[in-house]
Design a protein with these regions (language model features):
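NAD(P)+-binding Rossmann beta1-loop-alpha1 motif at the extreme N-terminus of oxidoreductases
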Residues: 1-44
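Conserved N-terminal Rossmann-fold NAD(P) cofactor-binding segment
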Residues: 3, 32-70, 308-310
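Short, well-ordered alpha-helices that flank and scaffold nucleotide-derived cofactor binding pockets
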Residues: 22-26, 49, 126, 153
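Structured loop/turn residues at beta-strand edges in well-structured enzyme cores
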Residues: 28, 68, 130
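Rossmann-like NAD(P)-binding element
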Residues: 53-108
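Rossmann-like NAD(P)(H) cofactor-binding subdomain of soluble oxidoreductases
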Residues: 85-150
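C-terminal substrate-binding/catalytic lobe of Rossmann-fold NAD(P)-dependent dehydrogenases
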Residues: 128-134, 143-317
């Protein structure tokens, strides 16, 4: 008997929408995908012309009403990357979308695919009343996978045998957790003392600098590159992990309440078990003192951004 199709609703406008849907189609997920955007009809028709080649999934134009029984809502907002669009206007737009989404009785998972995603996730939680485990951002999922690949290349082994994490927020506010990085079961830092021909402190420093240059969200650089493919690849992967209930450990943006010594709840990227219900379990790493200090500083930055928005709006409840 064929499995019931899952339902994905894409709300908000972004130049990533179509590429994200295309990447999901390549995964052959049995899904109904709805685009809630007044300019989506052309995109939907384009996908439907090729429907012979993606029979597992169907694509439709829709309204916010489609959120009522959606498994996942993917939340885009290109205005977050637009310098001409004020922070206050962005908050108003987020609130409007969330209220429309929740008015349908939505109770699924929200994937936040915007710039400043941890701030947006906190706003979505506040405006929606959804449990924190049902709101997830891309966090440092891309940076972590790239980190593992680069280490694998240094040691000339498979990335599948590298266990390491990038945590924090995005852009420069990320932390390579060297104290918890392993090749198989062997700590990578042990190679600095035992096998400096294979890896040096300079190698680690260069890799750390490289990781901070990974864009947190697509932007256009001087060559016109918007770094879209890497973003939608991890977004589609996260979608698959949830819809297939894979219970995988991913470094994504989740609300941390008491772990890591943080003083108040904040969305930040750390390892968590992700499945059909969203965040199944938070995995608290045993960080070094320096890593712990850096994480607290990053969490404070996110909290301060939310406080500024609250002051500017006279309260954002």
């Amino acid at each position: 008997m064929p499995s019931k199709k899952k339902k994905i609703v894409v709300i908000g406008r972004s130049n990533l929408q179509n590429l994200y849907i295309h990447t999901v189609l390549l995964k052959k997920l049995p899904a109904e995908i709805y685009l809630v955007d007044d300019q989506s009809k052309t995109s939907v028709q384009d996908f439907n012309y090729a429907s012979y080649y993606h029979a597992d999934a169907t694509i439709h134009a829709g309204t916010f009403n489609e959120c009522r029984n959606a498994d996942i809502v993917v939340f885009f907002q290109e205005e977050m990357s637009n310098a001409l669009f004020s922070k206050e206007d962005n908050v108003t737009l987020i609130k409007d979308k969330v209220k429309k989404m929740m008015a349908t009785g939505f109770g699924g998972i929200v994937l936040v695919a915007t710039a400043e995603s941890n701030v947006v996730a906190a706003l979505i939680k506040r405006f929606s009343g959804l449990p924190a485990n049902q709101i997830i951002t891309l966090g440092t999922m891309l940076a972590t996978s790239y980190f593992q690949v680069e280490i694998a290349q240094l040691f000339k082994i498979s990335p599948k045998n590298v266990h390491g994490y990038i945590i924090g927020d995005n852009a420069e506010d990320v932390i390579p957790v060297w104290s918890r990085a392993f090749l198989g079961g062997k700590p990578i830092l042990s190679y600095l003392a035992e096998e400096q021909k294979r890896i040096t402190a300079e190698n680690l420093q260069n890799l750390t600098k490289m990781i901070t240059k990974i864009p947190d969200f697509p932007f256009e650089n001087k060559d016109g590159c918007t770094f879209r493919y890497s973003t939608v690849t991890v977004l589609a992967e996260l979608t698959e992990v949830i819809l297939r209930d894979e219970a995988r450990v991913l470094t994504v943006g989740v609300e941390v309440k008491e772990a890591y010594g943080l003083e108040s709840p904040v969305f930040i990227s750390v390892p968590a078990v992700i499945g059909a219900e969203g965040v199944r379990e938070l995995l608290e790493l045993n960080l070094s003192d320096d890593e712990q200090k850096e994480l607290k500083q990053i969490a404070t930055k996110t909290t301060e951004k939310l406080e500024i928005l609250q002051l500017n709006k006279g309260g954002i409840s």
